[in-house]
A protein has these predicted regions:
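Negatively charged
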Residues: 4-245
Length: 245
């Protein structure tokens, strides 16, 4: 009887337009936590959706949310569909999928033109290798730890506009499979590359044209990146004050 009741509720929810419209990050995070408590893997949460007239997680209207930091933090079973979320207003995605160890869903069409902070966005998202090649990251100032321990990530990000980025600490730290082309990244504004490729064991891509004249910290940039043997002889390191190897 309980099974059929839940099934009926689920069917009804699918037929009802999503109405949940969070206005801030706190409201979104609270709703995500409640939904995933019921159905951790996909966010269908039929009881939560019906009782609050919210609809399923993937259908929520996130148009007004600016702060998406930690929304799926440690959601280690989640791999639901959030491809239809409107994230155009978002400015902060710090740790959004940090610890979401199974997440690998399609977010290729997200509009990120206002995002400035991608700290630890996919930290420890060790299943993530989805297509994010067309993301607009032109206003992002920090890529610190973005793919830290994203151990299988190796997708194409060659066309990203990184001209506003000023910090790349731990960006690919322990991104063990990463060896994608980042040769054309604009790094002219970057001032710190501490442990950027630390233990990125597969990495050996061309970085010869990177502009690092503003960088002051190169501590362990290629520490334990055992395959890296690229030509960086023309790098301008005049401002570097820390360069442990």
């Amino acid at each position: 009887m309980i099974f059929w009741l839940l099934l009926a509720v689920f069917i009804c929810v699918k037929d009802v337009a999503a109405t949940f419209t969070p206005t801030n990050g706190a409201a979104l995070k609270a709703a995500v936590a409640a939904c995933l408590k019921e159905t951790p893997s996909d966010g269908s949460c039929p009881l939560f959706a019906a009782s609050n007239s919210n609809g399923m997680l993937g259908e929520w209207k996130t148009d007004a949310v600016k702060d998406m930091s930690d929304v799926f933090y440690k959601s280690d079973s989640f791999n639901g569909d959030v491809s239809h979320w409107n994230v155009a207003a978002a400015t902060n995605m710090n740790g959004m999928f940090d610890g979401a160890t199974r997440f690998n869903s399609d977010i290729s069409k997200w509009s990120l033109s206002r995002v400035t902070n991608m700290h630890y966005l996919f930290h420890d998202a060790n299943s993530f290798n989805a297509d994010i090649s067309s993301w607009n990251v032109g206003h992002v100032t920090s890529l610190d730890g973005m793919f830290f321990q994203a151990s299988v990530f190796n997708s194409d990000i060659s066309k990203w506009d990184t001209s506003s980025v000023n910090s790349m600490d731990r960006t690919f730290f322990q991104a063990f499979m990463f060896n994608a082309d980042v040769s054309k990244w604009n790094t002219a504004a970057v001032n710190s590359m501490q442990t950027t490729f630390y233990e990125a064991e597969a990495f050996n891509a061309d970085l010869s044209k990177w502009q690092i004249s503003a960088v002051t910290d190169l501590q362990f940039t290629f520490g334990r990146a055992t395959r890296f043997n690229g030509d960086i002889s023309k790098w301008s390191i005049g401002k570097v004050t820390a360069i442990n190897r």
